[in-house]
């Protein structure tokens, strides 16, 4: 059985700033009437006011969110942001989505949370040890990573290969920015 987004408490977690991706998602989710909670080291209060986002502490965010979506870089502060301790503070049945970096989530803690039903579901566009399994076709190989194999065995977990940069537009933007940076250095 699925859940309704209407009226859900949604947490957008971005540790360095409510960045472009999180802001786009917030705009989409507000269309469903979702209440948005956010934690950010550098809150964008103008954006929050305009889009009815409530900045809060991590503890309040964990305690009140039905859905936790991670959109932040991997830093010393964010490594294993989702772990046994943070999961214990979350609502029962919470949905966790990670499109940021794999090591934002301690995978074994996620698995335990899924097994004991503390975590109701997970959507992972990144994985802690993804380098061997993503970015090239591995469909003819056996997965020898027992942790990844266990994650894939859950019917309430979706794992996709992180391909955020791999579009024509993104590659053109990367090339354009690189060329501009070179020009700026030479001038």
Predicted regions mapped to residue ranges:
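NAD(P)-binding Rossmann-fold cofactor-contacting core
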Residues: 31-49, 127-129
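Single conserved hydrophobic/aromatic residue that forms the stacking wall/gate
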Residues: 1-7, 11-12
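Rossmann-like dinucleotide-binding domain for NAD(H)/NADP(H)
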Residues: 93, 103-187
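Glycine-rich Rossmann-fold phosphate-binding loop(s) that bind the pyrophosphate
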Residues: 18-19
């Amino acid at each position: 059985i699925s859940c309704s987004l209407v009226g859900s408490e949604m947490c957008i977690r971005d540790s360095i700033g409510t960045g472009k991706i999180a802001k786009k998602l917030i705009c989409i989710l507000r269309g469903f009437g979702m209440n948005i909670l956010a934690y950010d080291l550098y809150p964008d209060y103008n954006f929050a006011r305009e889009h009815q986002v409530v900045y809060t502490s991590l503890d309040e965010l964990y305690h009140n969110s039905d859905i936790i979506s991670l959109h932040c870089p991997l830093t010393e502060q964010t490594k294993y942001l989702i772990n046994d301790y943070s999961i214990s503070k979350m609502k029962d049945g919470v949905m966790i989505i990670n499109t940021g970096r794999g090591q934002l989530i301690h995978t074994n803690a996620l698995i335990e949370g899924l097994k004991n039903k503390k975590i109701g579901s997970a959507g992972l566009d990144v994985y802690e040890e993804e380098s061997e399994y993503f970015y090239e076709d591995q469909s003819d190989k056996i997965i020898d990573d027992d942790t990844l194999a266990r994650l894939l065995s859950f019917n309430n977990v979706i794992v996709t290969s992180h391909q955020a940069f791999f579009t024509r537009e993104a590659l053109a933007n990367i090339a354009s920015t690189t060329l501009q940076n070179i020009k700026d250095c030479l001038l």
